Amino acid sequence: PGTPPVVLDRGYDLKEAAKMTVTAVGSDNGILCDGDNLLLYPQEEEEKFFQALKDEGVVLFEEKGDVEKFGAVLFHDGHPVPELVGKDAPVIAKAAGFDIPKGTKVMGLKIDAVGKANVLNKEIMGPIVVLKGYESFEEAVAMAIQNMEEAGGIGHTAGIFSNDRKHIEYYGERIPVARVL
């Protein structure tokens, strides 16, 4: 499975990252396995980054109970529910018990753990980006690797939003994928 983790590095343009995320996840309803599945962002930038996502039309769900409802409808016994694969964001939201604007292209779900601790870290195949904050860049890389080891995606794709060549190299040398975008 392709569950691409993407690290948003400190200092990268938050608005540009939000715009590119919507393009990656929303253009094909998350069917292609090369979009941002898990997006790791600097914790201290959460408010600004979430606003940038909202400005791009992303509907965010931050409350744990709300997010858990998506996990319950998207997966059954740990496997994707075929009826929701590739569906539009409002259709998936409705299945989880929420009404969102009809033209919504992407939803964001804030999680508190990576890997097997949350079923939403698996391949979703829908217009959803899963969001998790990090304290240090090294922690973000470790979480990306853990997520791939536990939820799938080793050998597939990963991404990074960064202007720091050393961070890009650090990520590229450690993340177990065939390509880093």
Question: What does each of the following model-derived ranges do?
Answer:
Residues P1-G115:
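ALDH superfamily catalytic-core signature
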